[in-house]
């Protein structure tokens, strides 16, 4: 009887065990939620309930409860079942086993690069490659790239590619990428890849001069441009003056060229220059460049030179213009009251002259202008007053001399006439009173009578008009004689008592 009772109880327990069921999805994808539901009779009390995976207890409850896996991963794949324990040991129950397989939503990403040994300064393209499951092509992914735990670019992006415009030697290191769903449930990381950036030595260093107008001018800005034809990375540029050998300046930048500026060039800055460039390899030097500094002309000085103490009509006036500073060639312009007279150049610097034959209209202000292409400078005005014509003064002096001679000759003629009359009267008186036997007078004594046709005409024996350098401008010497007859002309010419008239006019 007892045995029969035990068989009845065992049959009842077995019947209840068959009623404990585990409900779970058999196939899920990464990131999906998994709900395990253990179902059984609720008319009897349980001491505990548990969920198991591969014979390992996952979770224990005091009543029937669901077991939730929020986001499935591949490791969640396995055999699941649930169990209950009643108040009596005969009430222990175990559910059916459900095999769950978690499928991969997308493959583990792989980092690829356009080059894993790029040239410094060149671009690099990174790509995070993966593939979605054909059953879940509608899932959206986002990507992020890293170098040595540093996020590259703008961070997470829907694009699986990253373009780096230029990489440098310091960009050498380990790179990887991550891919995740936009819901952030599944995130996968690629393996790390090593990228080594190659540096290229610099080559062909050159020094170039840049100045306003293409020429270096005192007081203006000068730029010394040092450049390299090739090379990568940070380049250190330095500038030198050959005469001193000391560095004028230094710049380090990631560029193929750099500038050194001289704000205001001085005349002493003229000379030879060169530059050097270095990017960590052997420094390279440029060729030496000679830099001439052109000097603008200073304010010129105008000097006037004339033959006499005062300029006069007919004089040759020399206008000399000179700028004490200024690079040649210098062009000089000469002006009379803002009217251009002419120009003259000084190819080697210094001053220049311009000659002007003066007329009465040349009185006024004179000035000059100097220009060597770097700006014109004008001198101060110099006033000039022109006196009367020199030829006119000479004519007046000549006329005065002639009038003076005529006056002297007239006075002399009157005196000679009175002298002749006086001697004639005296002779007649002597002849009347002279005895008949008286002897004739001495042949050397003169008896003046009226002039006869044979009387020798007055002739000048010396005439001279002095040159400009002699004070005497006109002189005459006259010899006046009244011989009794042509026979004694020689005797009279040899007579020391002959009357001689000298006259001369000197320049006042």
From Swiss-Prot:
<feature type="glycosylation site" description="N-linked (GlcNAc...) asparagine">
    <location>
        <position position="343"/>
    </location>
</feature>
<dbReference type="InterPro" id="IPR013783">
    <property type="entry name" value="Ig-like_fold"/>
</dbReference>
<feature type="region of interest" description="Disordered">
    <location>
        <begin position="429"/>
        <end position="453"/>
    </location>
</feature>
<keyword id="KW-1133">Transmembrane helix</keyword>
<dbReference type="GO" id="GO:0009897">
    <property type="term" value="C:external side of plasma membrane"/>
</dbReference>
<feature type="topological domain" description="Extracellular">
    <location>
        <begin position="20"/>
        <end position="401"/>
    </location>
</feature>
<keyword id="KW-0675">Receptor</keyword>
<dbReference type="GO" id="GO:0035591">
    <property type="term" value="F:signaling adaptor activity"/>
</dbReference>
<keyword id="KW-0677">Repeat</keyword>
<feature type="signal peptide">
    <location>
        <begin position="1"/>
        <end position="19"/>
    </location>
</feature>
<dbReference type="GO" id="GO:0016020">
    <property type="term" value="C:membrane"/>
</dbReference>
<feature type="glycosylation site" description="N-linked (GlcNAc...) asparagine">
    <location>
        <position position="355"/>
    </location>
</feature>
<feature type="glycosylation site" description="N-linked (GlcNAc...) asparagine">
    <location>
        <position position="365"/>
    </location>
</feature>
<keyword id="KW-1015">Disulfide bond</keyword>
<dbReference type="GO" id="GO:0009986">
    <property type="term" value="C:cell surface"/>
</dbReference>
<dbReference type="GO" id="GO:0019903">
    <property type="term" value="F:protein phosphatase binding"/>
</dbReference>
<feature type="short sequence motif" description="ITIM motif 3">
    <location>
        <begin position="472"/>
        <end position="477"/>
    </location>
</feature>
<feature type="domain" description="Ig-like C2-type 4">
    <location>
        <begin position="300"/>
        <end position="387"/>
    </location>
</feature>
<dbReference type="InterPro" id="IPR007110">
    <property type="entry name" value="Ig-like_dom"/>
</dbReference>
<feature type="transmembrane region" description="Helical">
    <location>
        <begin position="402"/>
        <end position="422"/>
    </location>
</feature>
<dbReference type="GO" id="GO:0004888">
    <property type="term" value="F:transmembrane signaling receptor activity"/>
</dbReference>
<dbReference type="Pfam" id="PF13927">
    <property type="entry name" value="Ig_3"/>
</dbReference>
<comment type="subunit">
    <text>The tyrosine-phosphorylated isoform 2 interacts with PTPN6.</text>
</comment>
<dbReference type="GO" id="GO:0006955">
    <property type="term" value="P:immune response"/>
</dbReference>
<protein>
    <recommendedName>
        <fullName>Fc receptor-like protein 2</fullName>
    </recommendedName>
</protein>
<feature type="domain" description="Ig-like C2-type 3">
    <location>
        <begin position="201"/>
        <end position="290"/>
    </location>
</feature>
<keyword id="KW-0732">Signal</keyword>
<keyword id="KW-0812">Transmembrane</keyword>
<feature type="domain" description="Ig-like C2-type 1">
    <location>
        <begin position="20"/>
        <end position="98"/>
    </location>
</feature>
<feature type="domain" description="Ig-like C2-type 2">
    <location>
        <begin position="109"/>
        <end position="187"/>
    </location>
</feature>
<keyword id="KW-0325">Glycoprotein</keyword>
<dbReference type="InterPro" id="IPR036179">
    <property type="entry name" value="Ig-like_dom_sf"/>
</dbReference>
<feature type="short sequence motif" description="ITIM motif 1">
    <location>
        <begin position="446"/>
        <end position="451"/>
    </location>
</feature>
<keyword id="KW-0393">Immunoglobulin domain</keyword>
<feature type="disulfide bond">
    <location>
        <begin position="226"/>
        <end position="275"/>
    </location>
</feature>
<keyword id="KW-1003">Cell membrane</keyword>
<comment type="function">
    <text>May have an regulatory role in normal and neoplastic B cell development.</text>
</comment>
<feature type="compositionally biased region" description="Polar residues">
    <location>
        <begin position="441"/>
        <end position="452"/>
    </location>
</feature>
<dbReference type="InterPro" id="IPR003598">
    <property type="entry name" value="Ig_sub2"/>
</dbReference>
<dbReference type="InterPro" id="IPR050488">
    <property type="entry name" value="Ig_Fc_receptor"/>
</dbReference>
<feature type="glycosylation site" description="N-linked (GlcNAc...) asparagine">
    <location>
        <position position="234"/>
    </location>
</feature>
<feature type="disulfide bond">
    <location>
        <begin position="128"/>
        <end position="177"/>
    </location>
</feature>
